[in-house]
């Protein structure tokens, strides 16, 4: 009889928590271990962060597939809001005094007022019967002020982490298992400013494997042309500057993505677009879609002003142009338009990252975060009654880390060091780290091809062995290089065994 498969990563770490709790008395150490255990039992937390008015809440709505998050400046956009699965659907406002107020949704959306001043609110938790939230929790954060001078001395000033809202966002990022970060449209990248983004990772377990950047509102890039084409070189330049910090930079038109995903576009809206497309003279069309005011006031359009305003709120001018071209191409039904909007928004690439990569690797991300928290707990000094029990965590933690079956946890440690700027690598080795930590199955990195996969894995191990043994390497660099080398050696061993 074959041996039973090892328990999931999170189950092993949860058992470690239980073993420790059996010996811990009430105090800071016990509280920390209890919190670690509790977090292992909830879905992966994906935090959405970015600059003020960068489109965070709009993107959250697209991810959730419903228009729930507040997008207008108001109380809800100034607090951390977490979306979790739950029934009945409700809003729980957590005060700084620990009191929780329960509110109902207002026609399926966040209430306009939260019942207390925002400076007295610690966080807001929204429970929804939403399919995505069965697998992940999504956190919407207040905007960071990303328009300060690029030569500010501190990253906190550059990112706007000064004041209560910035501190709340930084705290949410530090607690995240995965991060979606919205960046402004940077036509001229500044390496120092962009690398400053990685400072948000301080104190967290985030890495390029668990982080992606979104170039938002790219529809404002090209008037008359395809903004996604205009955004591609900008995204490439930003991705190069953030290489090792995020897994990629994805251009997205958030409003189109929200309209395509959030079940707000109706057959009546499709008929309204047919009326817009009926203005078929090219010059008249250009005049009608020049500005929002031009569209609202165009005399030759047989459409009520309220209908025009609704279309603008869902599509904006670029979306209207996309819709008109789609109508010319034969689109008639709401379903036709939704497919067009989804494709034009660029959202599919982000959805793949969130649903397939982040949710697919939730076991690894959660276990990695939990083990880092437990390691910190083992060094607590302000809990003398639990000192011995906390120190006892170190040995079993090391055993889990050294288990070949859990090597993915150690690979994440390398990616985390790269993201935090504590490990600088040559380009070829950096590519290895990004590839191994981003792939759900690391073997795909070397290409599972008979006779060649083994050679590629052996070559990878050789590259890292050479770097590890370079006398210029520090002890930390050598240790992390050894982790990468062992990852390739494990793949080589698997391929070699199959070949036999």
Regions found by a protein language model. Name each.
Residues 68, 223, 362-363, 469-476:
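Short, flexible helix-adjacent loops and helix caps
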């Amino acid at each position: 009889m074959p041996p039973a498969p090892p328990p999931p990563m999170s189950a092993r770490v949860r058992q470690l928590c239980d073993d420790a709790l059996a010996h811990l008395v009430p105090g800071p150490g016990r509280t920390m271990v209890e919190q670690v255990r509790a977090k292992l039992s909830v879905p992966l937390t994906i935090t959405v962060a970015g600059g003020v008015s960068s489109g965070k809440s709009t993107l959250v709505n697209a991810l959730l597939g419903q228009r729930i998050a507040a997008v207008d400046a108001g109380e809800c956009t100034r607090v951390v809001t977490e979306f979790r699965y739950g029934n009945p659907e409700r809003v729980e406002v957590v005060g700084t005094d620990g009191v929780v107020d329960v509110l109902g949704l207002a026609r399926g959306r966040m209430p306009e007022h939260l019942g207390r001043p925002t400076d007295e609110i610690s966080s807001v938790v929204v429970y929804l019967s939403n399919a995505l939230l069965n697998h992940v929790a999504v956190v919407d954060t207040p905007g960071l002020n990303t328009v300060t001078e690029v030569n500010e001395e501190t990253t906190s000033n550059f990112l706007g982490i000064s004041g209560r809202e910035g501190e709340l966002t930084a705290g949410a990022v530090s607690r995240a298992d995965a991060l979606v970060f919205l960046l402004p449209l940077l036509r001229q990248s500044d390496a120092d400013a962009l690398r400053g983004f990685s400072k948000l990772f301080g104190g967290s377990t985030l890495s390029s494997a668990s982080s992606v950047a979104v170039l938002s509102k790219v529809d404002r890039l090209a008037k008359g042309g395809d903004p996604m084409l205009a955004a591609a070189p900008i995204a490439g330049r930003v991705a190069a500057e953030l290489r090792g910090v995020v897994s990629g930079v994805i251009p997205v038109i958030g409003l189109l993505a929200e309209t395509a995903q959030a079940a707000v576009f109706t057959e009546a809206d499709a008929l309204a677009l047919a009326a817009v497309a009926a203005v078929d003279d090219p010059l008249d069309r250009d005049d009608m879609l020049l500005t929002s005011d031009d569209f609202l006031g165009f005399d030759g359009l047989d459409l009520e002003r309220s209908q025009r305003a609704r279309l603008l709120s869902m599509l904006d001018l670029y979306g209207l142009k996309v819709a008109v071209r789609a109508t010319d191409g034969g689109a008639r039904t709401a379903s036709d338009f939704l497919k067009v909007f989804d494709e034009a928004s660029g959202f599919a690439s982000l959805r793949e990252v969130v649903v397939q990569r982040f949710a697919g690797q939730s076991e690894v991300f959660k276990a990695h975060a939990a083990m880092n928290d437990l390691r910190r707990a083992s060094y607590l000094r302000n809990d003398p009654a639990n000192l011995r029990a906390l120190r006892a965590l170190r040995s079993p933690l090391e055993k889990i880390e050294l288990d070949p079956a859990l090597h993915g946890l150690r690979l994440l440690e390398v990616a985390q060091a790269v993201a935090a700027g504590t490990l600088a690598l040559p380009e070829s080795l950096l590519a290895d780290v990004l590839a191994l930590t981003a792939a759900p199955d690391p073997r795909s990195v070397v290409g599972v091809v008979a006779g060649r996969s083994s050679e590629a894995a052996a070559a990878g191990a050789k590259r890292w062995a050479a770097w590890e043994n370079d006398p210029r390497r520090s002890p930390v660099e050598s240790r992390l290089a050894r982790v990468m080398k062992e990852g390739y050696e494990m793949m080589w061993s698997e391929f070699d065994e199959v070949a036999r």
